[in-house]
Design a protein with these regions (language model features):
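Active-site/catalytic core of tyrosine-dependent DNA strand-transfer enzymes
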Residues: 110-153
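Catalytic-site neighborhood detector that most strongly recognizes the C-terminal catalytic loop/helix
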Residues: 98-102, 183, 187-208
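Long, amphipathic, Lys/Arg-enriched alpha-helical "connector/arm" segment
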Residues: 31-58
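C-terminal secondary-structure termini that scaffold catalytic or DNA-interacting sites
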Residues: 209-233
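N-terminal DNA-binding recognition helix of tyrosine site-specific recombinases/integrases
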Residues: 1-23, 75
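Active-site-proximal segment of tyrosine recombinases
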Residues: 76-78, 155-157, 166, 173-187, ...
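Short basic/aromatic active-site micro-motif
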Residues: 60, 134-137, 153-173
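Conserved tyrosine-mediated DNA breakage-rejoining catalytic core shared by Y-recombinases
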Residues: 25-26, 31, 37, 43, ...
């Protein structure tokens, strides 16, 4: 069934089938438990800085990075048009309806990952040329070459960009329910499957606990106070 869904997605991406006719919108394929691959901040940096001379490979890399910073699926990226980009109070937002779920998603591009998606978008003369990717299998082949070029020993597919986005948002401390809305998940349980705890996140959280404990010890004779556990912001 997964293979059939892949073929249907490809037919939509190539224009042989209308997105409104997507047959799997209400059909859920059983999710197998397993580790979802994602890129660490260091691996993402390698892809950001790698020198790529081939124009088609550069295009694939930019599209992949754009989705690392927005969480778009391949099918949603390929459907983008100028109408999806709206200005709200002078800031660019991305509005679109997910091909897979039909959920409407609104992304404040200026607030996500220091506007990096906008920086990539502005390199291209129009969104039509940017969104015109080769078929998914060809894109994945290019991504494997890029991973090898960067010394990344992971099996990279286009969907890794979406999982990377979710993982890094959680790593930055964004609430899981907010990540759910940004990704367009109908259930927070789906978002929790996508989130991973990075080692650096564990270290950061434990250091925060240590700092709070030190604040408490500064008042040994006064007992514990509620304010000792609240950050002044």
């Amino acid at each position: 069934m997964r293979q059939l869904r892949t073929l249907v997605n490809e037919a939509i991406n190539q224009g042989y089938m209308h997105a409104d006719a997507y047959p799997f919108r209400k059909y859920k394929i059983k999710q197998e438990k397993g580790r979802h691959e994602f890129l660490t901040p260091d691996e993402l940096k390698k892809l950001e800085t790698v020198e790529v001379e081939e124009e088609s490979m550069r295009h694939v890399l930019d599209a992949f990075l754009f989705c690392c910073y927005t969480g778009l699926r391949y099918s949603d990226f390929c459907q983008l048009s100028p109408a999806n980009f709206i200005k709200v109070n002078g800031k660019r937002w991305l509005y679109f309806k997910s091909v897979k779920t039909g959920v409407e998603i609104r992304l404040p591009l200026h607030l996500l990952f220091e506007s990096r998606a906008l920086g990539i978008l502005d390199r291209y003369p129009d969104i039509g040329s940017f969104a015109a990717l080769p078929c998914n299998s060809e894109v994945n082949k290019q991504l494997r070459k890029l991973a090898e070029l960067c010394g990344i020993k992971k099996r990279i597919t286009y969907h890794v960009s979406r999982h990377t986005c979710a993982t890094l948002l959680v790593h930055q401390g964004v609430a899981i329910t907010t990540v759910q809305k940004l990704l367009g998940h109908t259930s927070v349980k789906t978002t929790q499957i996508y989130s991973e705890v990075l080692s650096s996140t564990i270290v950061r959280d434990l250091k925060n606990v240590q700092r709070k404990r030190k604040k408490v010890k500064m008042f040994p004779d006064k007992g514990l106070r509620t304010s000792d556990f609240i950050d002044n912001r």
